[in-house]
């Protein structure tokens, strides 16, 4: 079994190059590495070509966001298993890809395997051989089954995707009987302290995206759950002092929903409740 590695890049050239170095130094390395360069960032593309001539590069002239970039990368990947990273996330363990292959061999029913993700300033946990079936995943620290990703309909491409892209795809995978396995035996380091999450644009997007998620995937009878999720997000932002961007987020809900209405494909009430139940109570398995 072979594995592709994909990275979404934008403006952060040095971080992208650092991530590529770690990935290429893994033992064994992935069988191919692809990078998507967003928004016509030619300087980033040229730097990658100069330092890593064997890496396949895809570039979008428009700003398609990380989800839009991953859509293109997964579609272009040669192999069925696709390990996904951000421009500032990379494996902690040098045998990451070998471990990933062993996990997929043991759990052929897994549509996606998600690693334990650690951020700058956090204590890094041991690589315990533990795992559980989960509802959600992190797009910068996971391995997709390529066909399952494509069959689920890929990501909704959003420039600011916080609170939307991964949950949306997870719900659609769940509706198709797909399963997400999370394990601490795979570890990924996200080289950020998450300060950018305080950006007003991120705050606004996280509010509008929750409303969009409810509109796109929930049946009308469950839209009340979406309202509650938006309210909880607002309360969390207020408690954490992230007031800048809240008003913008609320007012952008109607146009945001309208612009993305073509993606509406609600799942059943049973699927939504099953997904939320799994989120509350993951199922432990033996690795």
Regions found by a protein language model. Name each.
Residues 205, 222-287:
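Non-catalytic, C-terminal membrane-associated alpha-helical segments of glycosyltransferases
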Residues 30-40, 58-60:
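Short beta-strand/loop segment that forms part of the nucleotide-sugar
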Residues 142-144, 148-153, 159-187:
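A short, conserved alpha-helix in the catalytic core of glycosyltransferases
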Residues 82:
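Short aromatic/hydrophobic "clamp" motif used to bind/position activated sugar donors
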Residues 90-127:
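Conserved donor NDP-sugar-binding/catalytic core segment of glycosyltransferases
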Residues 60-77:
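Glycine-rich, basic loop-to-helix element that forms the pyrophosphate-binding segment
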Residues 37-45, 89-90:
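A conserved acidic beta->alpha catalytic loop
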């Amino acid at each position: 079994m072979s594995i592709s590695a994909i990275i979404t890049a934008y403006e952060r050239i040095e971080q992208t190059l650092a991530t590529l170095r770690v990935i290429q130094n893994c033992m064994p390395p992935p069988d191919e590495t692809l990078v998507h360069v967003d928004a016509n960032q030619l300087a980033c593309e040229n730097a990658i070509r100069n330092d890593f001539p064997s890496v396949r590069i895809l570039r979008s002239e428009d700003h398609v966001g990380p989800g839009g970039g991953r859509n293109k990368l997964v579609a272009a990947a040669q192999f069925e298993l696709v390990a996904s990273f951000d421009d500032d996330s990379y494996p902690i363990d040098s045998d990451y890809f070998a471990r990933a292959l062993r996990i997929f061999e043991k759990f052929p029913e897994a549509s996606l395997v998600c690693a334990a993700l650690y951020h700058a300033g956090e204590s890094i946990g041991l690589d315990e051989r533990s795992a559980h079936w989960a509802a959600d995943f992190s797009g910068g620290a996971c391995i997709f089954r390529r066909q399952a990703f494509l069959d689920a309909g890929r990501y909704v491409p959003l420039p600011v995707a916080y609170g939307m892209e991964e949950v949306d795809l997870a719900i659609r995978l769940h509706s198709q009987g797909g399963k997400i396995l999370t394990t601490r035996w795979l570890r990924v380091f996200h080289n950020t302290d998450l300060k950018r999450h305080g950006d007003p644009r991120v705050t606004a997007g996280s509010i509008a995206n929750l409303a969009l998620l409810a509109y796109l995937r929930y049946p009308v009878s469950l839209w009340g759950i979406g309202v509650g999720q938006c309210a909880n997000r607002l309360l969390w932002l207020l408690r954490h002092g992230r007031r800048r961007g809240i008003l913008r987020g609320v007012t952008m809900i109607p146009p945001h929903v309208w612009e993305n209405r073509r993606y509406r494909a609600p799942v059943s009430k049973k699927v939504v409740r099953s997904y939320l139940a799994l989120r509350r109570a993951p199922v432990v398995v033996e690795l």
